Amino acid sequence: MNTLLMHCRPGFEGEVCAEIAEHAATLEIPGYAKSKPASAHVEFVCQDADGAERLMRRLRFADLIFPRQWARGPGFIELPESQRIEVLLAELASYPVCGSLWLEVLDTNAGKEVSTFCRKFEKPLRAALVKAGRLQEDPALPRLLLTFRSGREVFVGLAEPRNSALWPMGIPRLKFPREAPSRSTLKLEEAWHQFIPRSEWDKRLAPDMLAVDLGAAPGGWTWQLVNREMRVTAVDNGPMAENLMYSGLVDHQKVDGYQYRPRQRVDWMVCDIVEKPARTGALIETWIGEGLCREAVVNLKLPMKQRYAEVRKILQRLRESFDARGLKVVIGCKQLYHDREEVTCHLRRLER
């Protein structure tokens, strides 16, 4: 199992290559990354047979920015038109018994077509795996991840459930709320799922908390905060959706989001403004560093080139700034499924 397969947003294969190559070099695990433009996946081929397993053991998946999902295996294999299950059972003879099964496809137009095949194939495959003793429901065992590039080509991979994506392919199935004024609302909801354990939502996303939404109009992110019954200051020169204003929980301030400062410390600051990432990074540094908020979710809009390098530079600057202030801040950064040319940062200031 010398190959690490990683899913990603189409067009960001180069960022995944740069990110995993940097980590592998730091960990002294030799190998090379390979990908094709807009293929929505990257393979990192390790020189050592156990290289992919070592990478997954040494890295936290949650700390990776651009990969949506990962799995280790020997690479893609060919399947015949018939007797696919028999071929897969033979391939799995050298694998450990697995505790769960996910059939995955790539986030491409071709992948959408393959998903129909996967839905039909999963039931008989699952039954055959259970009968052969290759699959038993046990969250402590590795997850079997079968990534189909077509009905005839599959990556037979493994991953630990607690150190891989929360959802198949790293894609959450969130329902757009009809009352929300824009689809951007799903970005904030996905961020909460990604960065906050579900068991902590009632404590960290509680009613009557104070929140500030910078660049709020028309109110996609504000809607999520109001839906949690928070009291929100919506900062934007543009108009807010009327249904949000009728809630009685929103104070609309028509000022520049980068200039606004709250009169008192708030629980949450969220921001989805189209601006250069360095300026938004400085905004984060101020709000968290000066204690204006306890937690923040902020989108960084990415440049056309050197996107991974730019994000890494901003995150490093934030860490150095907080360290210099003697602050303990948990920082997370991920390109979410609902993100486009951007990444989402989550920051939580902890009291020492």
Curated annotation (Swiss-Prot):
Entry-linked InterPro entries: RlmM_FDX (IPR040739), RlmM_THUMP-like (IPR048646), RNA_MeTrfase_FtsJ_dom (IPR002877), rRNA_MeTrfase_M (IPR011224), SAM-dependent_MTases_sf (IPR029063)
UniProt superkingdom: Bacteria
Reaction(s) this enzyme catalyzes, per UniProt: cytidine(2498) in 23S rRNA + S-adenosyl-L-methionine = 2'-O-methylcytidine(2498) in 23S rRNA + S-adenosyl-L-homocysteine + H(+)
GO molecular function: S-adenosylmethionine-dependent methyltransferase activity
Keyword field: Cytoplasm, Methyltransferase, rRNA processing, S-adenosyl-L-methionine, Transferase
Major localisation: cytoplasm
Protein localization: Cytoplasm
Active site per the UniProt annotation: K301 (proton acceptor)
Enzyme Commission no: 2.1.1.186
Chain residues that bind S-adenosyl-L-methionine: S184, A217, P218, G219, G220, D236, D256, D272
GO biological process, alphabetically ordered: methylation; rRNA processing
GO CC aspect terms: cytoplasm
Top EC class, one word: transferase
Family, per entry: Belongs to the class I-like SAM-binding methyltransferase superfamily. RNA methyltransferase RlmE family. RlmM subfamily.
Reported function: Catalyzes the 2'-O-methylation at nucleotide C2498 in 23S rRNA.
Subunit structure: Monomer.
Protein name (record): Ribosomal RNA large subunit methyltransferase M
Organism of this sequence: Pseudomonas aeruginosa (strain UCBPP-PA14)
